[in-house]
Amino acid sequence: MKQLQAEITAFLKERDWLDQYNHPKDLAISLSLEAAELLECFQWKTDEIALKENREELLKEVADVLIYALQIAESMGADGEELVRMKLAENRRRTWPKKIKKSCFTK
């Protein structure tokens, strides 16, 4: 993932965007906006219909969200992969309420 973060940084440098727009607050706002675009693909549709009609667009929006998440990590001097691994380890140690352990969709 470090290589991916480096590619994103190179892309930003090529366009002279790194110093102008690569600040955690601005990136968090942009990530939220991209996540909203991802949600728009599902608005008023079932998962099945949304995936059938908008799969390509959905995947592009997922990529945008991932790119911004990695940019935030990079702007804070953190490694994205390391952050994900640390959070997964933390989640494994957590105790989850029985309510969420079982899917609300199962009967």
Regions found by a protein language model. Give the residues of each.
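Flexible "arm" and connector segments at domain edges
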Residues: 1-62, 66-107
